[in-house]
């Protein structure tokens, strides 16, 4: 059986990357929350 997680750097960046987060209001909210929490990594 094929596993469900088949890693792809491009897919990861497009779905969860910084530019994708910045492109929507809710995405920016996610980044703001992660900054507030003090996350070292903000986006994939």
Swiss-Prot record:
Comp. bias (Basic residues): 1-19, 26-44
UniProtKB keywords: Ribonucleoprotein, Ribosomal protein
GO terms under cellular component: ribonucleoprotein complex; ribosome
GO terms, biological process: translation
Spans annotated as Disordered: 1-44
Gene3D superfamilies: 1.10.287.3980
Coiled coil ranges: none
Entry GO MF terms: structural constituent of ribosome
UniProt keyword Ribonucleoprotein, yes or no: yes
Keyword Signal: no
One Pfam family of this chain: Ribosomal_L34
The family this protein is said to belong to: Belongs to the bacterial ribosomal protein bL34 family.
Protein name per the record: Large ribosomal subunit protein bL34
Annotated gene: rpmH
